[in-house]
Structures are given as structure tokens and as C-alpha cells.
A protein has these predicted regions:
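Short, cationic-aromatic polyanion-contact patches
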Residues: 1-9, 24, 54-63
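Glycine-centered, phosphate/nucleic-acid-interacting loop/turn motifs that mediate DNA/RNA or nucleotide
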Residues: 50
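Alpha-helix boundary/capping detector
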Residues: 16, 39-43, 54-55
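Short amphipathic alpha-helical interface segments
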Residues: 5-34
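Short amphipathic alpha-helical interaction segments
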Residues: 33-47
Length: 63
């Protein structure tokens, strides 16, 4: 049985996208209050883990 482990900030982003459906990186930045450089890394990691996908260039949603 394989479990995916997420950091607190990754969980926060997943929760935001679960509630809102789709958000731009600017909206995620404002709502999460995570620093921009850290948010970019979190979004990349979540994409690599297959949890989120980018949409329309700057948007993100759950996979």
C-alpha cells in the first residue's frame, strides 16, 4: 500500500483547489500567504506527484 505524504503547505494548496476548483498562481499566492518562491516549488512538486495540473497557462486545478 503506497501513501502519498504532503507537507502542511502542500495540503493547504490542495485544500484551496478542492474548495475553489481552479485558481491562478496569483490567487493561490494571495489566499495561501505562502512566499512566491516557495509556492512555485510547491506547485511544481504537486504537479510531479500528479495531484494538480496547470490550466490555461496560469491556472491550477486538482488532477
Amino acid at each position: 500500500l503506497s501513501q502519498k505524504l504532503f507537507t502542511l503547505n502542500e495540503t493547504s494548496i490542495i485544500s484551496l483547489l478542492h474548495r475553489e476548483g481552479q485558481l491562478s498562481s496569483n490567487e493561490l499566492l494571495q489566499r495561501s500567504e505562502i512566499p512566491q518562491d516557495e509556492l512555485a516549488l510547491i506547485l511544481l512538486n504537486l504537479e510531479l506527484k500528479g495531484m494538480i495540473k496547470s490550466t490555461n497557462g496560469d491556472g491550477y486545478m486538482l488532477s
